[in-house]
Amino acid sequence: MHNYKKISILLILSTLILSACAFPNKEKTENQVPAKDQLSMVQTAVDEYKKASGGLLPIKDRDDSYSIYLKHPVDFNKLKPKFLSQLPGNSFENGGIYQYVIMDVDKDPKVHLIDLRTSEVLKDIRIRIDASGKPLQLGKKVAPNVYEIEYKKYGFKKQPTVPSPYSNERLPVYMNGGNDFVIDYRLDLAKAIKKEKSLPKPGQDIRYLLYKDSPILPAYSPEFTINSKNEPVFKSKVKKY
């Protein structure tokens, strides 16, 4: 009986140790919250770097295959230590869950965030699809160049979703004809539209509504617009993701 208790205690301790190891630095509270002070700190550093370098920005070079939201990640190596004493706690480079990126690089460079938890979910979905050994099959057409995933063929119990960075919603994951994942932000866009006093025009890309009051960008999203009923819809011609 004494030995049984010792074994039980050892098992409990082992479980606790493994649990602690399973949550790296990115699980710390300061590494998860898109804190305004951290964002402001990086924005100030970017502005100072731009001024000191004659208009250049501290960004990593990426080609046109990347979407506008993922194309210009902040290069912290260019900011430390002269313009930034320490990396923000919630940055990917410091074990956090956010990728710092810059938007509107030509006119008014602003620092924003990409929630990398979304990327992790998409990576897991890709691994499961590839591991199935079955050729990719697109399901029901949702919009031009946007299709459901034939999830049952790849071992999923239901249509894949990702947690929204803007709400408590679960957002559907689809694919385009180029074998890329796209995320359907219409649930969040519908809420954003209701808050607007001046509605956008049909045909206008309305994704900006999502980061109008949030530092987080809608990564992996096709373009969305508004229809005659003021509902968010996929744009008829999808080009960049």
What is the predicted function of each stretch?
Residues M1-S8:
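Bacterial N-terminal signal peptides that target proteins for export
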Residues L16-A20:
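C-terminal motif of bacterial Sec signal peptides marking the signal peptidase cleavage site
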Residues A22-N25:
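Bacterial signal peptide processing site
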Residues T29-K36, S40:
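Juxtamembrane membrane-water interface segments immediately C-terminal to a transmembrane helix
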Residues K36, K50-K51, R62, Y69:
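Short helix/turn-capping signatures at newly exposed starts of structured segments
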Residues Q38-L56:
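N-terminal alpha-helical signal peptides/signal-anchor transmembrane segments
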Residues I59-V121, S132, K140-Y241:
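Extracellular/periplasmic head regions of type IV pilus-like filament subunits
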